[in-house]
């Protein structure tokens, strides 16, 4: 949302960001300071039509001229990391990379960097670092989307396979504490 608000502000576009009301006050204040209209909704599971992703889609469909970025399922997110982030990491490391890990929000960074690095060297290990309370660790370890516990780490800890995560080359998964994640 912050990236969208930054670009929209610079280009003179209106931006509307929909997010759960459980997000931090600092994030909300930053978005507003960047000129975004902020709509907060109660936290809800993805299966609910009240989930912030579904709410944002509906608002975009009902607003003339609106573009729905859908950063979770729009694979342009992943592609940007294949074409830029992975290239930057590869070049800065002179191609000497054993592995890459990160937590998942949209899935774009992990999947995109993973795909980009694996295209250069299939032996690079790609690992998911998932906080307690998130479901992806269980999915990649045991094939079941199941979450136990909770986390205060904001913006990470996905509970579904997003469009960006589909076909992600994840070799390992780690359960991490909030302290490790932050």
Question: Could you say what each language-model-derived stretch is?
Answer:
Residues 2-61, 132, 136-145, 161-162:
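Active-site-proximal loop->helix
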Residues 3, 11, 46, 74-171:
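Glycine-rich phosphate/pyrophosphate-binding loop at beta-loop-alpha junctions
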Residues 15, 38, 67-68, 126:
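Hydrophobic beta-strand scaffold residues
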Residues 36, 66, 170-171:
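Short, conserved active-site loop motifs that form the nucleotide-linked donor/cofactor pocket
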Residues 41, 69, 156, 176:
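Hydrophobic residues at beta-strand termini and immediately following loops
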Residues 58-66, 70:
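Phosphate/diphosphate-binding glycine-rich loops and adjacent basic-rich segments that engage nucleotide
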Residues 171, 178-182:
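Short, intrinsically disordered, charge-balanced linker/junction segments flanking boundaries
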């Amino acid at each position: 949302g912050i990236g969208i608000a930054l670009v929209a502000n610079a280009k003179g576009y209106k931006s509307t960001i929909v997010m759960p009301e459980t997000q931090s006050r600092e994030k909300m204040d930053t978005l507003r300071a960047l000129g975004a209209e902020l709509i907060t909704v109660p936290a809800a599971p993805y299966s609910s039509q009240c989930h912030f992703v579904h709410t944002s889609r509906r608002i975009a469909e009902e607003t003339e001229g609106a573009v729905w970025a859908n950063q979770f399922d729009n694979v342009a997110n992943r592609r940007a990391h294949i074409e830029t982030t992975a290239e930057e990491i590869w070049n800065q490391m002179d191609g000497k990379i054993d592995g890459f890990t990160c937590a998942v929000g949209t899935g774009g960074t992990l999947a995109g960097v993973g795909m980009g690095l694996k295209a250069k060297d299939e032996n690079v290990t790609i690992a998911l670092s998932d906080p307690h309370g998130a479901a992806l660790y269980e999915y990649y370890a045991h094939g079941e989307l199941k979450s136990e516990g909770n986390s205060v780490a904001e913006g990470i800890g996905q509970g579904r396979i997003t469009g960006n995560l589909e076909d992600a080359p994840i070799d390992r998964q780690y359960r991490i504490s909030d302290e490790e994640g932050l």
